[in-house]
């Protein structure tokens, strides 16, 4: 689960490397974000020629979490790291490539562009 102050890897080619969650969107008292939830985050580490510079506030969707979570069919899935993809104002991915696997739950949340760019969908 991702909550305030959680640091996540960035799974796209915007140039940002690490982000820190500031807030979880989607409810007045929503504390934890799961796969497919949108968060507000601050870019903590980026490459010098990045689209998302260090210190900027961005919106991102969580694509991988380390905590095991149950699917409706009864199976469990977990990933090796917490990762997110940075979004633009239209809730589309800002980058043109996605690195690493992403969860199938993004399809239910209408992030089909991320699924089409991802090399593997679990």
From Swiss-Prot:
InterPro entries the record matches: Ribosomal_uL14 (IPR000218), Ribosomal_uL14_bac-type (IPR005745), Ribosomal_uL14_CS (IPR019972), Ribosomal_uL14_sf (IPR036853)
Any one GO molecular-function label of the UniProt entry: structural constituent of ribosome
Keyword check for Cell inner membrane: no
Family under the similarity heading: Belongs to the universal ribosomal protein uL14 family.
Alphabetized UniProt keyword annotations: Ribonucleoprotein, Ribosomal protein, RNA-binding, rRNA-binding
Function: Binds to 23S rRNA. Forms part of two intersubunit bridges in the 70S ribosome.
Any single GO BP term: translation
Coiled coil (residue ranges): none
Protein name: Large ribosomal subunit protein uL14
Subunit structure: Part of the 50S ribosomal subunit. Forms a cluster with proteins L3 and L19. In the 70S ribosome, L14 and L19 interact and together make contacts with the 16S rRNA in bridges B5 and B8.
Cellular-component GO terms for this entry: cytosolic large ribosomal subunit
